[in-house]
Amino acid sequence: MLYYPHIDPVAFRLGPLKVHWYGLMYLVGFAMAWGLALYRARDPKRHWTAQQVGDLIFYGALGLIIGGRLGYMLFYDFSNFIANPLTLFQVWRGGMSFHGGLIGVIVTTWIFSRRTHKRWMDVTDFVVPLVPLGLAAGRIGNFINGELWGRVTTVPWGMVFPNAGPLPRHPSQLYEFLLEGALLFIVIWWFSAKLRPRFAVSSLFLLCYGLFRFTAEFFRQPDPQLGFVAFGWLTRGQELSLPMIIIGGFALWWAYRHKER
């Protein structure tokens, strides 16, 4: 059994301003995405400029933050949102949803594609290899905050988290770091290294993320305000990941069936 190594969620202070590790992880994620995008943009076959990359990162960040927060309130805390809609803007209380962020990024990349006269599927194929490292950074932020812990376990690496009772739990944030971050990055970055049929890269991302998240949810403690949403075992995260698996699998088949580059 391990004990959570208490880490101050505040990384440093600038006068009265507190800079939290979680916020820094978002910045690290965006910085890594920007760097990887610039690296990929050097390939003339991809038809991207540095200016377009910078604009894309801005649109992506906007969609992620707005969609992530709104998605959390709608998917995970709807009753509180209806009772007090202003809680949407209380971002300091925490609460972000990947699935909401995904919807937000879909919208903003569509707007970006219209403004730059690029095909939306080409934009998403360029974006998704950048996403997993950002997800990895976010899960490290969750671990530093001691939040989103796992279910009670007897495995030797079970960890006692503050505010989670005396029993050891799965460090599910680290599982998600490995699955949705490191492993997903390796798979999608390798797959996208060659030019693939249009939307194949995006489809594989949807399929793999859905599978990895669905698996990780078996070790993660369900949100207390929701519990299990169906069958006595299905979580909200799994419920939202199922459409990704289905759509991703079908879209991958469709992309190779048409083989449009």
Swiss-Prot record:
Name of a matching Pfam family: LGT
GO biological process, one term: lipoprotein biosynthetic process
Subcellular location: Cell inner membrane
Disulfide bridge partners, by residue number: none
Pathway assigned in UniProt: Protein modification; lipoprotein biosynthesis (diacylglyceryl transfer)
Enzyme class: transferase
Membrane topology type: Multi-pass membrane protein
Sequence positions that bind a 1,2-diacyl-sn-glycero-3-phospho-(1'-sn-glycerol): 139
MF terms (GO), sorted A to Z: phosphatidylglycerol-prolipoprotein diacylglyceryl transferase activity
Keyword line: Cell inner membrane, Cell membrane, Membrane, Transferase, Transmembrane, Transmembrane helix
EC number per UniProt: 2.5.1.145
GO cellular component, as recorded: plasma membrane
Membrane spanning stretches: 19-39, 56-76, 92-112, 126-146, 173-193, 199-219, 227-247
InterPro entries (UniProt xref): Lgt (IPR001640)
Keyword Transferase: yes
Purpose: Catalyzes the transfer of the diacylglyceryl group from phosphatidylglycerol to the sulfhydryl group of the N-terminal cysteine of a prolipoprotein, the first step in the formation of mature lipoproteins.
Family per record: Belongs to the Lgt family.
HAMAP family linked to this entry: Lgt
Listed name of the protein: Phosphatidylglycerol--prolipoprotein diacylglyceryl transferase
Organism: Coxiella burnetii (strain Dugway 5J108-111)
